[in-house]
Amino acid sequence: MLGAARRQLGSGPMLGQVLRRLRPATAAAADAARAYSAAAKEMTVREALNSALDEEMSADPSVFLMGEEVGEYQGAYKISKGLLDKYGPERVLDTPITEAGFTGIAVGAAYQGLRPVVEFMTFNFSMQAIDHIINSAAKSNYMSAGQISVPIVFRGPNGAAAGVGAQHSQCYAAWYAHVPGLKVLVPYSAEDARGLLKAAIRDPDPVVFLENELLYGESFPISAEVLDSSFALPIGKAKIEREGKDVTITAYSKMVGYALQAADILSKEGISAEVINLRSIRPLDRATINASVRKTNRLVTIEESFPQHGIGAEICMSVVEESFEYLDAPVERIAGADVPMPYAANLERMAVPQVDDIVRAAKRACYRAVPMAATA
C-alpha cells in the first residue's frame, strides 16, 4: 500500500509553472438535492467517487488532484483511475510521501483561487498535516475577515478496515468536527459519495471528506437524477434511509449499513426503527434528528469512533437541549471500544460496533427484555 510515489512534485519554478497554468474558474452554484427515483442502475462507491472527480475536473479547470500514488498508480484504492491519462500530470499530481509538504502546497494553491483535492492514503496520515488543515485551511477565512476563501477538499479512507492495526484504523470524524471553519462529510452509499464529493469540491470552504475503505467495492442502486452531471447533495442535510415510529437510530458511513440490518431484525420483533444517515457531521442536521426523536420518543446513536467526546455525545446533547420532554427512555449510545484498535481479527471485531449491539440497544430503549447472556 505504501509503495513509493511514482512522480515527485518539485518546488520552485516547476511548482510555479504548474499553478500558473491552472486557471481559476467561477464556482458552480450549489445544486438542491434531487428526489430519489426508481433506480436506473447500480454503482460502486469507488465508481461514484471517480465519476464525481472526473466530472468536476472537466467542468472546472481550477480543480486538481494531488497525493501519494494518485497518478500513475491511479490511487491506492483506484479512486483516480483514468484521471492522469485524461487530465495530465499538471492536474493529477503524484507527490512524495510527505503529507505536511503537499498539504501545505495545496492550501497555498487554494489561497490563490484554485480548488485542490488532497488525497490521504489513509486519514491516519493526515495527522502529519494537521497544522495546515487546522491552523491554515480552517482558520484563514475568519482571520482575514472573509477576504481569503480556502476551497479545498481533504479526502481518503477513514476508520477501521480489516487487520491494519491501531495506526491505520482510527476514525477522525469527531476530531475534525470539533474545528470551526471545517465542514466534515461522511458518505455511506454511492449516491452519498457522488453527491457529497461534488458538493465538497464546489464549496468555498475547506471540507474534510471521510470515506470508508470497506465500502469502496460495495454497489448501491443509483438513479438517473444522481447520474446527472449537475447533481450535488446539500451539505448539512441528513437522509432518512428508513422510516419508523418506535425508535430513532442515527449512524454515518459504514455504520448506516449496520443500522439498516438491525432495523430489519427489529421489524421481525415488532419494533419499527427509523434510520437516519447523517451524511454531514459538521454542520450536523439537528432539525432532522430532533424531528425524528419527537416522533419515536427514543434514540440510539451509533459511531465507529471512540466514545468520549464523540458524535453520539453531541447528538445526545442536541436532543436533551431541544427535545428532552419527548424522550420516553434514556438515550442509548453505541461507539467503538475506548482502546487503540487491536490487530487480531477477533479483538478487532469486538472493538467495533456490530449489528447485534444495535439490536440490543434498540430493545433496551423500547423496554424490551434482553437476555442476560446477550448482554455479557
Curated annotation (Swiss-Prot):
Protein name: Pyruvate dehydrogenase E1 component subunit beta-2, mitochondrial
Keywords carried by this UniProt record: Metal-binding, Mitochondrion, Oxidoreductase, Potassium, Pyruvate, Thiamine pyrophosphate, Transit peptide
Cellular localization per UniProt: Mitochondrion matrix
Subunit-structure text: Tetramer of 2 alpha and 2 beta subunits.
PANTHER family for this protein: DEHYDROGENASE RELATED, PYRUVATE DEHYDROGENASE E1 COMPONENT SUBUNIT BETA, MITOCHONDRIAL
Annotated catalysed reactions: N(6)-[(R)-lipoyl]-L-lysyl-[protein] + pyruvate + H(+) = N(6)-[(R)-S(8)-acetyldihydrolipoyl]-L-lysyl-[protein] + CO2
GO molecular function terms attached to this record: metal ion binding; pyruvate dehydrogenase (acetyl-transferring) activity
Positions that bind thiamine diphosphate: 99
First-level EC class: oxidoreductase
Pfam families: Transket_pyr (PF02779), Transketolase_C (PF02780)
